[in-house]
Amino acid sequence: MSDISHVILYSKKNCSYCIKAKNLFINLGLNYTEKKFEDFKNIEALFEDAGKQVRSMPQIKINGQLIGGYNQLIEYLIDKKLVNFKGEPIK
């Protein structure tokens, strides 16, 4: 897990996959910074911060790299051997 040091979660209100991502980070013991869609002054500011024109939430950046949404996060964590194919933490 040592190679995952800086996590940013772009989220918005009432987003079930945002909540799933937060819970997963907590269960894995990963610290993260949450940036809420509603806190950006405009959509361009969000695009600039994320580094891409994002179309859905959540969006996750790890160590400066935009991973993508929740499904891409699960794929990333499977590759790191931190979760199983169901997205459950591997103990």
Residue ranges and their predicted role:
Residues M1-H6, S11, E48-D49, D79, ...:
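C-terminal alpha-helical interaction module
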Residues M1-T33:
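Local sequence-structure signature of Cys/Sec-based thiol-disulfide redox active-site neighborhoods
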Residues K12, F37, G64:
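Conserved residues at beta->alpha junctions
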Residues N23, N27-E34, E38, E44, ...:
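Terminal leader/tail segments of proteins
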Residues K36-V54, D79:
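Thioredoxin-like thiol-disulfide oxidoreductase module
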Residues G51-K61, Y70-N71:
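Structural micro-motif
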Residues I62-I90:
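Non-catalytic, surface beta->alpha helical segment in thiol-disulfide oxidoreductase systems
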